[in-house]
Amino acid sequence: MDIRNEFLQFFQNKGHAVYPSMPLVPNDATLLFTNAGMVQFKDIFTGIVPRPSIPRAASSQLCMRAGGKHNDLENVGYTARHHTLFEMLGNFSFGDYFKEEAILFAWEFVTKNLGFKPKDLYISVHEKDDEAVKLWEKFVPVDRIKKMGDKDNFWQMGDSGPCGPCSEIYIDQGEKHFKGSEDYFGGEGDRFLEIWNLVFMQYERSNDGVLSPLPKPSIDTGMGLERVQALLEHKLNNFDSSLFAPLMEEISELTSLDYASEFQPSFRVVADHARAVAFLLAQGVHFNKEGRGYVLRRILRRALRHGYLMGLKEAFLYKVVGVVCEQFANTHAYLKESKEMVVKECFEEEEHFLETLESGMELFNLSLKHLNENKIFDGKIAFKLYDTFGFPLDLTNDMLRSHGACADMQGFELCMQEQVKRSKASWKGKQNNADFSAILNAYAPNVFVGYETTECSAKVLGFFDSDFKEITDANPNQEVWVLLEKTPFYAEGGGAIGDRGALFKDNGEVAIVLDTKNFFGLNFSLLEIKKALKKGDQVIAQVSDERFEIAKHHSATHLLQSALREVLGSHVSQAGSLVESKRLRFDFSHAKALNDEELEKVEDLVNAQIFKHLNSQVEHMPLNQAKDKGALALFSEKYAENVRVVSFKEASIELCGGIHVENTGLIGGFRIVKESGVSSGVRRIEAVCGKAFYQLAKEENKELKNAKTLLKNNDVIAGINKLKESVKNSQKAPVSMDLPVEKIHGVNLVVGVVEQGDIKEMIDRLKSKHERLLAMVFKKENERITLACGVKNAPIKANVWANEVAQILGGKGGGRGDFASAGGKDIENLQAALNLAKNTALKALEG
């Protein structure tokens, strides 16, 4: 049975609109990942956005529970039901039907569509929800309905907001396999398995904890697809179902082991984590040192450790990830489209960790011999595994689990505090809804007229201070936010900065508009007050001329993404952008730096579309129709039922709410000024067009004239070659080795930069001069940084050291344990590379 399709078709027949799975990275600062089906409807439930035209919804939502409040990572592989990535089937009512219909729908689907026997089904309800008990008694004997407390059967979104009792459907898997003391309905055993949770959102909890009935109660339900699949196949473990069979077969082939062997938990960990890695990479999450990228890294490294237990000492996970991409190609087309990029990025991350995995395992195994009688693992060693060898703490604890031990958390935290604190993203976020509730209740969304005009007459609805508390009037030299009845100012969004401009009254300027932002559907402009204004004043709102330059750069960004996909492949997707009046910045998914030929092709393609003078076309259509037309959409964006589509004939088509030029010819010209790395798997292009393009051409022409003068040669290339020959001749003389040498614990440490000379030869000379050495020498040449490093009788491998430092330069190193070299084109990161080189060496020496 195709459970997903069966579920969605069932609820579509019951009048529900079917919604696609939203991205795993939600447009919600309070969440690390999308962890439930209701996440994409959160703003509807809280009243921030209006109810959709069809107030019933159904979805099959991909969810991630690793990191953050909901973290199942440590349990995966050791239990029958835990996953990092899973699909949640759900039906929702936004003030339409309530308990009676929700219970009826659930019972019908479970017994008729899924075919579960009514005699095997049990129900839990909240202890005070007598209404639900009466409704369930129509289908289930009262002795199979159990009342439970708030802990088990009361759901709330946060400390305040919508909440209500819930009711769960359980299935009895039979006493044949479950005979423990806790295997009774309501016990902690696995015999009675929850399959569906129905949440009855009927209350609003105030900040002081008081519950008030909601005027329009709602429904939110969730049922795990993997769990249902296993039950239908009479499997006692989710991983034993056909959903995971292709992955188990691949792992068995790679390891030459049987799934039913002692390594079964490791099979399950690798299978689960391969799914998570595939979907996260395909949806634009990349390996990183913080936030979501670090969770992704932890998942991969945990999988590699379990592969290591099964004898896999080389990269392997990328092969299992490839199977995931093929398995889900029909239901999630983007996995197939991005398979090459996903597999490549996974392989490179594996290679990086495998360089330190074996050394880290040696330290771990050695330290196990010194466990104290309480089986507490030294926190300092746990920190060294984390800091030097890249072992996340949960990975170390996972390894300790099989030895009945755990890490000294206090000791680990002390080491962490002593280290220089890296900036960390706080994914908990702020509950801003309460700050705006009064404004949302008082004002309807203001009208945006900026697509049609850059100037309009408008009434001042209100002024607000920096905390968005309403104030009655605005006086000279104040900075305040204003809400206009209608506004021509475009609010920051889609990477484009907010409009600036001015307000006029009685033919005089009364305020400068510094910025424009949208909060919960309201467009606010930040003002610098020149003359006193009060609520109710009628003003003329005028957008500044820089709007046109922003529009040029915004349209150029669309053409750029299209060109990148044509040159590099369809795996390219937007990872971030900034659109200003004098430049654009575009971040995109791609595993390696673009070479000169690729950059030239991209630039030529964009300019070719500019010179074609293509007219822009703006259409409004249903989201599914837009996607069918091939419109590009952001994974991180949450779209409405109807969307705005901007296209430039065959050159580009995207979902976009921004301001654009009417014709590509108005962009003028396009130049890429820089290409660099942002993080693993994410590249950045910076470019200019319009007036900024012309200004750059003027400056470069001026520099060219100056170069001719300095070289005393109208042929600049010939003049440079002559100068290079002169420099080359001067370098034939021996180069002095004026590099700083520090002696630490008997080892000579050399980290520095030279302007000329053969750095490989310098390393050789240093090695011959010193008995114990750690040396890394950098040199700028041909718009790149090259480095060479040598190790002699010191506790670090040259190839590991060089490769780690090279990554910050956008490159990769290679070599042996005693000598290695590397290079990269991110010249601006030289100082950071020097710092990393020295700190890595110091850690190795101090260890």
Swiss-Prot record:
Belongs to the class-II aminoacyl-tRNA synthetase family. The lineage of its organism: Bacteria, Pseudomonadati, Campylobacterota, Epsilonproteobacteria, Campylobacterales. Catalyzes the attachment of alanine to tRNA(Ala) in a two-step reaction: alanine is first activated by ATP to form Ala-AMP and then transferred to the acceptor end of tRNA(Ala). Also edits incorrectly charged Ser-tRNA(Ala) and Gly-tRNA(Ala) via its editing domain. One of its GO terms (biological process) is negative regulation of DNA-templated transcription. PANTHER family: ALANINE--TRNA LIGASE, CYTOPLASMIC, ALANYL-TRNA SYNTHETASE. Binds 1 zinc ion per subunit. Keywords: Aminoacyl-tRNA synthetase, ATP-binding, Cytoplasm, Ligase, Metal-binding, Nucleotide-binding, Protein biosynthesis, RNA-binding, tRNA-binding, Zinc. One of its GO terms (cellular component) is cytosol. Its cofactor is Zn(2+). Consists of three domains; the N-terminal catalytic domain, the editing domain and the C-terminal C-Ala domain. The editing domain removes incorrectly charged amino acids, while the C-Ala domain, along with tRNA(Ala), serves as a bridge to cooperatively bring together the editing and aminoacylation centers thus stimulating deacylation of misacylated tRNAs. This is Alanine--tRNA ligase. PROSITE patterns: AA_TRNA_LIGASE_II_ALA (PS50860). It comes from Helicobacter pylori (strain ATCC 700392 / 26695) (Campylobacter pylori). It catalyses: tRNA(Ala) + L-alanine + ATP = L-alanyl-tRNA(Ala) + AMP + diphosphate.
